[in-house]
Amino acid sequence: MIHFTKMHGLGNDFMVVDGVTQNVFFSPEQIKRLADRNFGIGFDQLLLVEPPYDPDLDFHYRIFNADGGEVEQCGNGARCFARFVRNKGLTNKQKIRVSTSNGKITLRLERDGNVTVNMGIPVLEPGRIPFNAKKMEKTYLLQATNPDSTMQTFLFGAVSMGNPHCVLDVEDIEAADVEGIGALLTRHERFPKGVNVGFMQIINSGHIKLRVYERGAAETLACGTGACAAAVVGQLQGKLDNCVRVDLPGGTLTINWEGEGKPLWMTGPAEHVYDGQIQQ
């Protein structure tokens, strides 16, 4: 039997598995079955806690989307990861350092129950996002072919928070065609590894509303790295302050970023739902 915990960060839900004290392996097919909300456990991502590869770190953090594919980063998942390893007694530290497939992040458990994540320095160079562009811009232009073969032009900012994001400004977040445009852009050829697509409505310089179409998972109730990406793009374009409240369908995150070349900090909740076990 494999023990797991169901958790969520603002409704972005996860199956979290301890791979430190348990010997576990999940194939992409198994993850797809487990992620199914009718016939499985149901989740946006599976989070796997592994022993560290570096003696200076506490854990290794792996993330798998509902389609079975492994991805580089998940901000909401990182907060749940921190809460999980403390709740399960895998560490007694307030500050936890973990590696991912794309780098290292620091997690800090706050006294109010929230978790703050040092998401690292946002990557803006197109080739490292990765996004095919001749040079770095604050705003990019892209053309995409609609299902009816008509062409549509999009203006957006692009950034990697350990995973690729593009962020579009919208006037009305409720009216935004998140599913249609998200599906059109997420696998566009100019994003070699696909992209998460954010739709940002600016309320004022310290407050935005956001919906995100996640690569491999469609629209979710919240996307932590998407909130980070939106704050970065808005600040680079001169529209947002250093500290931004981000309202997502599942709740609110606070993003702090002092500007280009500086690390970004994300603060928000991480909730335990239930513990369970499955046969493997």
Swiss-Prot record:
One of its GO terms (cellular component) is cytosol. It catalyses: (2S,6S)-2,6-diaminopimelate = meso-2,6-diaminopimelate. The record marks H165, E214 as: Could be important to modulate the pK values of the two catalytic cysteine residues. Substrate binds at N12, Q45, N65, G75, N76, N163, N196, E214, R215, G224, T225. Pathway: Amino-acid biosynthesis; L-lysine biosynthesis via DAP pathway; DL-2,6-diaminopimelate from LL-2,6-diaminopimelate: step 1/1. The active site is at C74, C223. The record marks Y274 as: Important for dimerization. Catalyzes the stereoinversion of LL-2,6-diaminopimelate (L,L-DAP) to meso-diaminopimelate (meso-DAP), a precursor of L-lysine and an essential component of the bacterial peptidoglycan. This is Diaminopimelate epimerase. It is found in: Cytoplasm. InterPro entries: DAP_epimerase_AS, DAP_epimerase_DapF. It comes from Shewanella sediminis (strain HAW-EB3). Homodimer. GO terms for molecular function: diaminopimelate epimerase activity. Its EC number is 5.1.1.7. Belongs to the diaminopimelate epimerase family. Keywords: Amino-acid biosynthesis, Cytoplasm, Isomerase, Lysine biosynthesis. Pfam families: DAP_epimerase. GO terms for biological process: lysine biosynthetic process via diaminopimelate. It comes from the Bacteria. Its main location: cytoplasm. The gene is dapF.
